[in-house]
Structure formats: structure tokens, C-alpha cells
Amino acid sequence: ALVAELAPDGQFNVVGVGQTTSKGLKKGVVVNIEATVQSIQKALEEAEVMADRQIVQVFTGIAGNHIVSFNSSGMVAIRDKEVSAGDVERVLETAKAINIPTDQQILHILVQEFIIDGQEDVREPIGMSGLRLEVKVHIVTGAVSAAQNIVKCVRRCGLEVNDLIL
């Protein structure tokens, strides 16, 4: 377990660390809920003592051979000929409108680039002029059950899960 605080410059400073033997997990996947909860609690307690604060919200790691990633893309017409936050949201929705197995869920959508009227490598499209907005993304999926089980273990420790991270 790591406890970090956000510094004014946008960097994270680690203020607490807790570690223990990882029991209840096999190859990154929960195989025993009670053992996993005990391992999380022990690491959490150590980290809280070092950081001198109680932790209530966490970003939880997820791993395992159930993690799959692939590329996707999307395209929309730009409303009002100037890219808005709504246009960006719409194009991302089209990129993730893909068929994935019912036992998988999207964990992350990583934007690789935006393209405006054929102009590639656009990083910040909002405010730019154009007629067509495209996006290339990398999508990471994981098993629904694996995600639910690790979240369940963390919640049993009295923590709120903000997000799952790789």
C-alpha cells in the first residue's frame, strides 16, 4: 500500500508505505476473499501509521492474464465548426462503442491522438476549427469478476475505490 499526497506542482509525494505477504491472490486475481482482505488490512495499517493519517479512498491495482488491450478509433462531425468538450466526449464514445465479451469490462481508454480534418497528432483539440474530429485510442479491458472481487475485498476494509489501475 502506498499513501501519496498531491504537491502544488502536480507531482505525487509518497508519505506512507505498507507491505505484507500477498495472501489470497494468485497471478493477480483474488482466489480467497478473506485472506486477501487480511493482507490489504495489514498493508493499509502500516501505510496509515507511516503517513500519520487515516485512508478512506484508494486507487486499486488490478492485474492478471485476463487483462486485454487493443486499438480502436472513432469519428464525429464537429458541431459549430469548433471542437467543444462535447465533441471530444462524443468521439470518445464512438471509439469505445465496440463489442467486447460480456465477461469483460473496459478499465482504461488511453487517447493516442486526435485528428481534425486529416491533421494528425493533435493533443488538445478543444477550441480548434474543423469539420471532422477523429480519435485513435488504446482500450484496456479486464474480467468483470476479477474487478468485482478485488473491489469487494478493498471495500470490506472500509475503503472507497476511486478507480482500478494497472
Question: What is each residue range found by the language model?
Answer:
Residues L2-L166:
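Nucleotide/phosphate-binding catalytic cleft detector across ATP-hydrolyzing
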